[in-house]
């Protein structure tokens, strides 16, 4: 596993959820290993391959399981033991286990009654937030996977939770609903709620999350904004695509710079490898101008969560 510095230790004064050296194991399997991280207001994306410990962490945060060592605190209290703090956390699980005989409206009202929500309009507001009112009286057994996900999100929101934990909430949603749910989650985070979202669709997390935590083998591999994490990897090669009228001439000139480790000509254009991306960015245009070469595009190839994630799990 690639070892990276944690660029944002995340133990700010406004942290709502704190995980302090928490370990969880099931028999001989270690699911979390001395994990230390925290979550505050806004949206945090939780990334990692299968078996990384994401769902275990979410279950510990919501109090569904305890930790074997260390501590998990939500608003300074133990979510496993404190019923008051449990009521302030809502979970949308990844699994599709829903009472299929209920309608969406009945599901949301059931959750509202279970939590003692007395506002008679709360269920309608929650259904409206996820665009479920037109289908609210249809039974869940007839819903698509994406519609069931939206019904579960509505059920979670009916309690107006300060802490919202979402395990793959966009799974099965159509493109329009993905956009709407993404906007909703960002709005909830902007309101000051702590929103924790796991997803395997890294490009969606990139659009959704203010911060990213990457778990590998139950440990925290990286934390912070994805660009900040990439900046912390400045001792590792980065790749920049340059499209120009005369790529061979430009590549030869760039190779003479101390900022470039290598160049290769591909169908997409000239790919430059560098460990000093900032210096390269400042040098490309002057070199092209001196050569009389027209630049058409200069774009980093590895400045996305997808490429970052691949490098982290190598």
Stretches found by the model and what they are:
Residues 2-7, 276-314:
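C-terminal coupling/interaction segments
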Residues 37, 262-265, 298-300:
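Hydrophobic/anchoring residues in structured secondary elements
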Residues 80, 118, 203, 248-249, ...:
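Short alpha-helical
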Residues 1-23, 314:
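ABC-family P-loop ATPase nucleotide-binding domain
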Residues 125, 140, 267-268, 301:
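Residue-level "edge-of-site" marker
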Residues 14-217, 222:
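ABC transporter nucleotide-binding domains
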Residues 182-274:
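ABC transporter nucleotide-binding domain
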Residues 2-9, 125, 225-231:
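Short, flexible cytosolic linker that couples an ABC transmembrane/permease module to its adjacent nucleotide-binding
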């Amino acid at each position: 596993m690639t070892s990276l510095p944690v660029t944002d230790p995340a133990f700010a004064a406004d942290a709502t959820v704190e995980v302090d050296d928490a370990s969880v194991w099931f028999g001989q399997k270690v699911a979390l290993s001395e994990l230390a991280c925290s979550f505050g207001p806004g949206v945090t994306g939780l990334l990692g391959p299968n078996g990384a410990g994401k769902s275990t962490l979410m279950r510990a945060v919501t109090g569904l399981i305890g930790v074997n060592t260390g501590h998990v605190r939500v608003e300074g209290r133990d979510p496993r033991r404190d019923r008051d703090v449990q009521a302030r956390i809502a979970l949308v699980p990844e699994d599709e286990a829903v009472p299929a005989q209920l309608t969406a409206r009945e599901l949301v009202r059931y959750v509202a009654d279970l939590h003692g929500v007395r506002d008679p309009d709360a269920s309608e507001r929650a259904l409206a937030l996820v665009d479920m009112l037109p289908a609210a009286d249809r039974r869940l057994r007839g819903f698509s996977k994406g519609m069931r996900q939206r019904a579960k999100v509505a059920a979670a929101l009916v309690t107006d939770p300060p802490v919202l934990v979402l395990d793959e909430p966009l799974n099965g949603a159509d493109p329009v609903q993905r956009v709407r749910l993404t906007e909703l989650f960002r709005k909830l985070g902007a309101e000051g709620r702590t929103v924790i979202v796991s997803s395997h669709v890294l490009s969606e997390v990139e659009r959704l999350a203010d911060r990213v935590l990457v778990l590998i083998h139950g440990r925290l591999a990286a934390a912070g904004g994805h660009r900040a994490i990439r900046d912390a990897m400045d001792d590792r090669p980065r790749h920049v695509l340059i499209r120009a009228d005369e790529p061979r001439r430009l590549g030869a000139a760039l190779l003479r710079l101390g900022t470039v480790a290598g160049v290769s000509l591909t169908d997409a254009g000239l790919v430059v490898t560098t460990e000093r991306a900032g210096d390269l960015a400042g040098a490309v245009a002057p070199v092209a101008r001196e050569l009389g070469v027209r630049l058409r595009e200069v774009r980093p190839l590895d400045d996305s969560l997808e490429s970052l994630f691949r490098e982290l799990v190598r």
